[in-house]
Amino acid sequence: TVIVSGGMIQKDFALDFLKKLQKENKDQKLQLVAADRGLDFFRETGLVPDLADGDFDSVSAEGKAYLDSLTRTRIMKLQPEKDDTDTQSALNLVIDQGARSILILGATGGRLDHFLGNLGLLTLGKQKGVKVALADEQNYICLVESGTRLYKDRQFGKYVSFFPAGGAVEGLTLEGFKYTLAGYNLTVADSGLTVSNEIQEEAVSYTHLRAHETVLDL
């Protein structure tokens, strides 16, 4: 499942990334979801969402006309005053429908408060047993748990960075990286230590944390 949120989005990157995802999941059609102003991405690219969710208060006039023209799209109109964002509402909806792997585009560029809120959706997904990731043309952001293997030939970009997802991370070990760690207690205050690392081994690099702790992988 791919949710397109209302933040800034590089359309050429997004279209290429969607093609890549569909190729990797050739036996199953991607479910495409427009979260509020993310609807404009579909209007501008000619793609048709399977689901449109939001109060649509920030959608352009052209986007609202496009919304009215959709005949094969399930539309969930929300009240402007609510207890979550349109992106979180869309995420909860597709999880309730059975989605187990969700990518969110348009979630990193624009308002910083929305970006920080979208980072929290990674933890929300983990709590519900669902993998959630955010992506743009420069970043792929997900949670990393103990024992995660990162393959050099599959990595998104040149660099790999780690940040605590919540409180301090105890016992962080990085093997096979340019800058290794052994049993390090990583806090937000010193997370600059784990910025712009590089996978050194050709095959695989390892992360190890104590049980039930996670870090953000960018």
Where would I find each of the regions flagged by the language model?
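Short phosphate-binding loop-to-helix
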Residues: 75-96
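N-terminal beta-strand-loop-alpha-helix module at the start
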Residues: 1-66
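Short Gly/Thr/Asp-enriched flexible loops that form oxyanion-binding sites at enzyme active sites
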Residues: 113-123
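Class I SAM-dependent methyltransferase SAM-binding "motif I" and its flanking Rossmann-like core
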Residues: 123-155
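Conserved small/polar residues in nucleotide/adenosyl-binding loops
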Residues: 207-214
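A conserved acidic, glycine/proline-rich C-terminal tail/linker
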Residues: 176-201
